Regions:
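Short coil/turn connectors at secondary-structure junctions
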Residues: 1-2, 37-40, 46, 50, ...
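Histidine-rich, glycine-flanked metal-binding segment
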Residues: 1-52
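Short, glycine/acidic-enriched loop or turn micro-motifs at the edges of active sites
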Residues: 16, 28, 59-61, 179
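Short secondary-structure boundary/hinge segments and terminal tails
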Residues: 41, 96-98, 128, 156, ...
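Metal-associated gating/positioning segment near the N- to mid-region
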Residues: 46-110
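Active-site mouth loops of central-metabolism enzymes
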Residues: 57-70, 91, 118-131, 150, ...
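Divalent metal-dependent hydrolysis catalytic cores, especially in the metallo-beta-lactamase
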Residues: 74-97, 113-125, 139-154, 170-178
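Histidine/acidic residue-rich metal-binding segments in metalloenzymes
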Residues: 104, 131-211
Length: 211
């Protein structure tokens, strides 16, 4: 059986960042990482990165009712080409995952995906900052992440309840923290580069003040 040698790539793993060869056995598993390795087939990957698959924590994928957005198929195809093996599907209008039925529908659509899709439910109904979604009902379907990506959660009582329920159901919250008054006109991080390009920047304090 043949062994594939990925020669001269940039290896990123828990050991660090280094140039090395990677030998893949006939079962498709990594057999060895090092210098000067031999294999029955060799692929020159100089200038390329070899690593575990990336995970996109903020992906927007449209459904059948949202034809203008990227579809499950096209979105995951782009992800795979970029080295991503999983994407977290964030809930946004008009595809809002704020009940068990919408979760199941998205999971069915995910069968068309070319990589793993991790469904993130909406922490609030209709992505409205004022009303908490049924976190228990949604988490019972297997969802372990919930996002608050819409309007800022200025209703602190709702925010408190969401955080308490997240502990009860052992779920992870994904917050988009940005003060709209400080970031409304910004298009990139505020700094020397934004000044040089003449592009309005978003100051770090816009996120810090929300946290």
């Amino acid at each position: 059986m043949s062994e594939l040698l990925l020669q001269g790539g940039r290896v990123l793993d828990k050991s660090g960042d280094r140039l090395a060869d990677v030998l893949i056995d006939s079962q498709g598993r990594i057999a060895e990482i090092g210098k000067g390795l031999k294999g029955t087939e060799t692929l020159d990957v100089q200038g390329k990165i070899i690593s575990s698959g990336f995970v996109d924590l903020n992906a927007y994928l449209g459904g059948p009712e949202d034809q203008l957005s990227e579809t499950i198929t096209s979105g995951t195809e782009s992800a795979v080409k970029g080295g991503y093996t999983a994407v977290v599907a964030i809930s946004r209008d008009p595809v809002v995952v704020d009940n068990a039925s919408s979760v199941k529908a998205l999971m069915e659509l995910s069968q068309e995906a070319l990589c793993e899709i991790i469904v993130a439910g909406s922490a609030t109904l209709h992505n409205d900052a004022g009303t908490m979604s049924p976190l228990g009902e949604i988490s019972a379907t297997g969802v372990r992440m919930f996002s608050a990506i819409g309007p800022p959660l200025t209703d602190f009582e709702t925010t408190r309840r969401i955080m308490e329920y997240s502990q009860k159901y052992e779920i992870t919250l994904l917050y988009s923290c940005s003060n709209s008054f400080l970031s409304s006109n910004g298009a990139m991080n505020e700094g020397s580069v934004s000044s040089q390009l003449g592009i309005p920047g978003i100051p770090t304090v816009a996120e810090e003040i929300e946290v």
